[in-house]
């Protein structure tokens, strides 16, 4: 169910980014770079992700 939600939201974001890219190429470059960075961070910290979501870090 969680995986389905992630897939659906990524498809929605892809469509949104495509529409923005058509009208604002510079913004499109920034967003695509941001998405790539977030994806890499997610893949690196995948093991910690569920722990952080379940138990927010208290400072």
From Swiss-Prot:
Signal peptide positions on this chain: 1-21
Transmembrane segments: 25-45
Keyword Signal set for record: yes
Cytoplasmic side: 46-59
Any one GO cellular component localisation term in the record: host cell membrane
Its membrane topology: Single-pass type I membrane protein
Swiss-Prot/TrEMBL keywords: Host membrane, Membrane, Signal, Transmembrane, Transmembrane helix
Disulfide bonds: none
Localization (cell): Host membrane
Extracellular side: 22-24
Organism domain of life: Viruses
Protein name: Uncharacterized protein ORF59
Organism: Acidianus bottle-shaped virus (isolate Italy/Pozzuoli)
């Amino acid at each position: 169910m969680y995986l389905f939600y992630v897939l659906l939201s990524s498809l929605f974001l892809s469509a949104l980014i495509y529409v923005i890219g058509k009208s604002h190429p510079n913004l499109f470059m920034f967003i695509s770079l941001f998405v790539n960075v977030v994806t890499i961070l997610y893949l690196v910290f995948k093991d910690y992700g569920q722990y952080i979501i379940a138990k927010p870090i208290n400072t």
